[in-house]
Amino acid sequence: MNPKLLEILVCPVCKGQLEWKKSAHELVCPACRLAYPVRDDIPVMLPEEARAVGPDEVHGQA
């Protein structure tokens, strides 16, 4: 994930900062506990495409 892109992307639901989870190819919003998929290096920032994440995934290694 391009660090500059990560700086400007925010959660579409709460406008919070996102965390890049490289192993899962997802951008995670710790505030909403939603994970947005990254497909072919393109973040899919649609709430209907996000999945709920458990508390262990928010700041964990996922």
Curated annotation (Swiss-Prot):
Pfam family, one: Trm112p
Cross-referenced Gene3D superfamilies: 2.20.25.10
GO CC, one annotated term: cytosol
HAMAP family: UPF0434
Family that this chain belongs to: Belongs to the UPF0434 family.
PANTHER family in the record: PROTEIN PREY, MITOCHONDRIAL, ZGC:162634
Name used for this protein in its record: UPF0434 protein Tbd_1506
